[in-house]
Each structure stands twice: as structure tokens, then as C-alpha cells.
Design a protein with these regions (language model features):
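A short, flexible beta-alpha/helix-coil linker loop
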Residues: 16, 135-137
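As written
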Residues: 125, 180-183
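Flexible glycine-rich beta->alpha loop in the catalytic core of nucleotide-sugar glycosyltransferases
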Residues: 134-135, 183, 190-191, 231
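Short, glycine/charged-rich beta-strand-loop motifs at protein surfaces that mediate ligand recognition
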Residues: 138-142, 164
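Active-site neighborhood of HAD-like aspartate-dependent phosphohydrolases
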Residues: 214-249
Length: 249
């Protein structure tokens, strides 16, 4: 599966600890329906079996909205649930093992924070890289902040590999990334810690569209659902055609 820079625009990473009893799948669908362009299932306290179960439940939602969906770290869960791929950190499974287990058609993303890691990602043929941490983050307490200068240098090494900035990024600080060469932002608490995850996603989608120069037709229906003409709008057109018995040609 080919990953583009546009896919990196708004990369949502799950974390159920922020949900405070809200239904996980309902929140995930809100995020997918309101502008997330990529989704990663990342639940560090979940068992392998729980990850597979959640992934299988999310998979049809991601397909419905046309959003690439990967699992953090667990390559065997990614294979069992048959999701789009996996994201591996520097302390997780190595790229060659992941590729052997998942096959050539699956997405493999890698975390990059040093020149050596950047060179390795290019050499291995990573489908995309997550670069950072850009800011201090509670999800990775041992991560060191990557300076703006280092970020620019590392993105310059990536050739045609899409880059998403990671680590402590939110609506208020993402302007810092303009001109660094990254294609988008990965966020956790900036969406999932918000009381209204749908609104948080819409706000970030609109801001990143402007920040990274992605032009999209943004329309909202009467319920506040963002109709992104591609693919959400197409999904809604298909649904309405089926409901009223029109033929789709």
C-alpha cells in the first residue's frame, strides 16, 4: 500500500486512558469522520489479544472512511487482524522481520530521531517515518526533544519518504513545524484528551490543511459531520444512492 505525504497530514494515535469512560469505537469513528488522514492503534497496556480484538473492530471503520490504519509495534497482531500495516519504534521489531511477517504490500512506518536512524530508514525502504519527539510528551517520558535544526536536517535526508512529526504536538504549537519539511503531525492527547474529539479533529484538520498547503473542499452537514469530498463525501454519496435505490455507475 502506497503512503503519500498527504496521508501524513493528520495522523491520529489512539490512547484509551484519555477517554474517561467514553465508548472507544464511537470516538474512533468521530475522529475518522472529522478529518484524520491516518490512524494508529497504540495501546501500550493492552494484551496481544486485546489489540487484535480492537484492530478487527476498527478495520471496517477505517475502510469506510478510506483512512490507512496501522498497529503500533505488534507485527503479529497486524498480521492476524489484517490491517494496513505496522509502526515500529527503534526498540520494537526490526524492519526486515516486520516485512517478512507482513509481506510486501503492507505499510511499515519507522521512528527516526538520529542521522543513523534516518539513513537506515531510507536504506530499508520504510513507507513513512515518524520523526521526533518534537516536544516533551507524556506518552514517551524518555524521549528527548528534537531541535528544529535537527528536524530540518533529518527531513532533508528522507528523499521521497513521507514524514510525520511526532511528540507533544497540539493545535497551539504545530505552527512551529512550518517550513521544516514534515508532511504532517501525529497527535494523541490533542484529540483523545479533548472532551469533543470530533471538534478537536476538525480544528486540527483545517489548521494542518493551511499549514502544510493541502487544499481540500471542507463541508459540514447539519449534524456537524465533516464531509471531506475524498473519501467521506464519496462514502456518503454511495450510502444515499443505496438508500434511495439509485444505480451507481
Amino acid at each position: 500500500m502506497k503512503v503519500t505525504g498527504k496521508d501524513m497530514q493528520l495522523y491520529a494515535v489512539t490512547d484509551t486512558q484519555w477517554l474517561n469512560g467514553r465508548d472507544f469505537l464511537e470516538v474512533v469513528e468521530e475522529v475518522l469522520a472529522n478529518g484524520a488522514t491516518f490512524l494508529q492503534l497504540r495501546e501500550k497496556n493492552a494484551t496481544h489479544e486485546e489489540i487484535v480484538e480492537k484492530a478487527k473492530a476498527i478495520k471496517p471503520l477505517a475502510k469506510k472512511y478510506g483512512v490507512p490504519f496501522v498497529i503500533d509495534d505488534d507485527i503479529y497482531a497486524a498480521r492476524e487482524a489484517d490491517v494496513d500495516g505496522v509502526h515500529i519504534g527503534q526498540n520494537d521489531a526490526d524492519y526486515m522481520t516486520a516485512r517478512k511477517v507482513l509481506g510486501e504490500d503492507k505499510i511499515i512506518g519507522m521512528t527516526v530521531k538520529t542521522k543513523e536512524q534516518a539513513e537506515n530508514a531510507v536504506r530499508m525502504g520504510a513507507d513513512y517515518v515518524g520523526m521526533g519527539a518534537v516536544f516533551h510528551t507524556s506518552t514517551k517520558l524518555d524521549a528527548k526533544d528534537l531541535s528544529r535544526e535537527s528536524l530540518i536536517e533529518l527531513t532533508g535526508m528522507m528523499q521521497s519518504i513521507p514524514v510525520v512529526a511526532i511528540g507533544g504536538i497540539n493545535y497551539d504549537n504545530c505552527d512551529y513545524l512550518k517550513g521544516t519539511g514534515v508532511d504532517g503531525i501525529a497527535v494523541v492527547s490533542a484529540i483523545f484528551a479533548r472532551k469533543d474529539c470530533a471538534a478537536a479533529t476538525r480544528e486540527l484538520f483545517i489548521k494542518t490543511s493551511e499549514l502544510f498547503g493541502y487544499k481540500r473542499n471542507i463541508i459540514f452537514d447539519m449534524d456537524g459531520l465533516m464531509i471531506d469530498t475524498e473519501p467521506v463525501g464519496n462514502m456518503l454519496v454511495k450510502t444515499s444512492h443505496e438508500k434511495f435505490g439509485y444505480k451507481i455507475t
